Amino acid sequence: MVKELKVAEAYQGDVGRGIARIDPYTMEELGLKPGDVIEIEGPKGKAYAIVYRGFLEDAGKGIIRIDGYLRQNAGVAIGDRVKVKRVEIKEAKKVVLAPTQPIRFGPGFEDFVKRKILGQVLSKGSKVTIGVLGTALTFVVVSTTPAGPVRVTDFTHVELKEEPVSEIKETKVPDVTYEDIGGLKEEVKKVREMIELPMRHPELFEKLGIEPPKGVLLVGPPGTGKTLLAKAVANEAGANFYVINGPEIMSKYVGETEENLRKIFEEAEENAPSIIFIDEIDAIAPKRDEATGEVERRLVAQLLTLMDGLKGRGQVVVIGATNRPNALDPALRRPGRFDREIVIGVPDREGRKEILQIHTRNMPLAEDVDLDYLADVTHGFVGADLAALCKEAAMRALRRVLPSIDLEAEEIPKEVLDNLKVTMDDFKEALKDVEPSAMREVLVEVPNVKWEDIGGLEEVKQELREAVEWPLKAKEVFEKIGVRPPKGVLLFGPPGTGKTLLAKAVANESGANFISVKGPEIFSKWVGESEKAIREIFRKARQSAPCIIFFDEIDAIAPKRGRDLSSAVTDKVVNQLLTELDGMEEPKDVVVIAATNRPDIIDPALLRPGRLDRVILVPVPDEKARLDIFKIHTRSMNLAEDVNLEELAKKTEGYTGADIEALCREAAMLAVRESIGKPWDIEVKLRELINYLQSISGTFRAAAVELNSVIKATKERESAEAGEFSELKNAIGKIISVLSPAKEKIEAVEKEIDKFLEVINKEELKPSEKDEAQKLAKYLKDILGKLKEMIDNIYELENKLNTLKEQVSAEEIDEIIKTTQNIIQRFTTSLDELKNILKDIESIRLKVSTKDVKIKKEHFMKALEKIKPSVSKEDMRVYEKLAQEYGRATSVEKKKEEGKEVI
């Protein structure tokens, strides 16, 4: 039975697998079962696929879902009608494939390709795609044995040719399909009706008596898929694709730039249907009244003339791409030239998931990889960012197995390739390195602060959840009940109460991007630059929404206007800030959080509803909150049994969160200082030896000068004279005079080495740390032994000199001097080695002495004497009064009624 069905695009998971999906009712009508082979006949060719059940949402629509490769094989596009019937096929004995572009492959690659296409149905001329570590390679079936459509089995012999097929080499049609584009369903639909429809069915427009569109302008941030969309349209429409990049057509000769542009348009018309794609069109067609050079003006005029002169009735279409549409010459943006402007925006969650599915399509993913989670956490990521994320995750997986790979070998073992998997941990690590493109120019953080990291402040946390987290996480609920979420929140209170920490926590818990803005970064000496900085911050935030903009110390950025003549710049910044807050259209998913300890000097216009809707007092913590803060800051500390956190919470009335953190840190430092105690005896003796060797370095230098003098004097003669002999004895005598005490100090250090090892063996150190200490002791023994040996050599030299007469040969003198110089050199280099050993011993002592350090009650009591509360009762009363004025915080009277502690 044969049935006509309408072609629809494939699901992402089916791309490249050679399968077609038909709804269950149509399959039953055609007598098909899942796994059967069907023939898909289009007007220009046939394709063969394995059929599977479609989803119920397709029921009654009469559609067949096939990917771009099957559509090309059948010579059809989305929306065309094809004839579908069940066919019987034979098993392939041999299949010969050729790439569409030159490639080189090593031994074993044919088996790899065979595993990838196992079970697929192939016919001569059909295309198949093979995923290799995230990259898709396209092959064309050159021949099959037996002829006709065949299924690849375990017994099929697959042969690969290295040379690409000739007809593929000559084409200018890009190898991109609509399934390679994620998150742009609506945009693809618009572009198809503007470009693909006139190219494939010009008779429709002739019947209506209208001119088909000549141009489409794609507008959107970099990396959103503008170029990819243009390539996909060209491929699906079967059009030749010509790319114009500004620098390539520019020439230093007058008129040659316009000539280059004309040639491209002429070639496109000759080879119609064609698509001319002008990337970053704002670079070659800027506003003529603002253009600085004559070349740009002439180029714009030429482009206008060429677009007006297109006669192909939809067979030649110009697609321009830009992220700066307002920089384009207005004459280009009228109907008849660029008829339609399509905005390619930042993808939403579903769009991000589609893009991730595309880029992980050819990756060996581990079972723990959750693309839904990745789509949730990649707010603000465009397609290029998600591609970079997948690539970075794959590189991390590769780095993990790299040590076990012999890079010099001709071929990587099959078991290594089979075990190469990209895990969820690889993606999580990659997320730390890859950030949204829109956020790279602004200070952006991914805060790692959670609600449980903030002690107390339960009322403030709840208000922030309601004002920020709920609208971002459950936007549809607010839309349903018709409530506009707050645009901004002002946190005010004394310094150190946790305002910045709260902003970070709400950004983290809501899963939003976080832009931190500080006053000095905003202000510029150039007129208009400060306001521009504010505009850019909000633009970037909207682009990477959901996003939280955090203005710390906002009183420095937005003080009351009109104070004096010198405040002109800040007045303009305030005006710009007000405009941006009012201009945030619904729903933009951008929330402003500001923090200050001086709300009284902020411009009142900022604090009205519709701008900073919520004004929340962040108070000094009460006793319960202080206890929570103590628990947070001491959770990783080794507290003694006598430490009572409840008692400490009572004693720290008026302390802010920052004060309590400083208190805990000071108590810990006191405990560490006490536990480290006195240095070990080996350290004392070794330091004495080092100090002594440093003190005698001057004697060594003086002896070296005298030795050099003797060398010069005896260089020309065969023997030394009496004066030179005496000078030599004098130099060696100086060295001996200082080395006798050195030997005693060396022996004193040697005695302590065994004691040092006894201490190390008693302590509960890691085996590696004990091994390191033992190696250090052996190294020290070796150095000290060599130094003692050198001292003995000096004594031997002195004895030798005493037995010699004053007439000594030059050779004997030379030997004595060289030996003495070696001894001096050895002592000098040993000094640095001994210093390094001393540092290592100190480091070991710190590990040993602080291993079981406990922070006691007395340490906290001493710290309390040192760390005083930074906020007085009078200060807190001022903040409570301000809170009552704003009418948006809990008053003192209400707290008293509820029996709460009041500062």
UniProtKB/Swiss-Prot annotation:
Alphabetized SUPFAM superfamilies for the sequence: ADC-like, Cdc48 domain 2-like, P-loop containing nucleoside triphosphate hydrolases
Q: Which SMART domains match?
A: AAA, CDC48_2, CDC48_N
* Intrachain disulfide bonds: none
The record lists ATP as bound by 220-227, 493-500
Tell me where the signal peptide lies.
none
**UniProt cross-references to Pfam families, sorted A to Z:** AAA, AAA_lid_3, CDC48_2, CDC48_N, Vps4_C
Matches recorded under PROSITE patterns: AAA
Q: Which GO terms describe its molecular function?
A: ATP binding; ATP hydrolysis activity
| Record keywords, A-Z | ATP-binding, Nucleotide-binding, Repeat
Q: Which GO terms describe its cellular component?
A: cytoplasm; intracellular membrane-bounded organelle
Q: Which domain of life is it from?
A: Archaea
Q: Which family does it belong to?
A: Belongs to the AAA ATPase family. CDC48 subfamily.
Q: Which NCBIfam families match?
A: CDC48
- Protein's UniProt name: Cell division cycle protein 48 homolog MJ1156
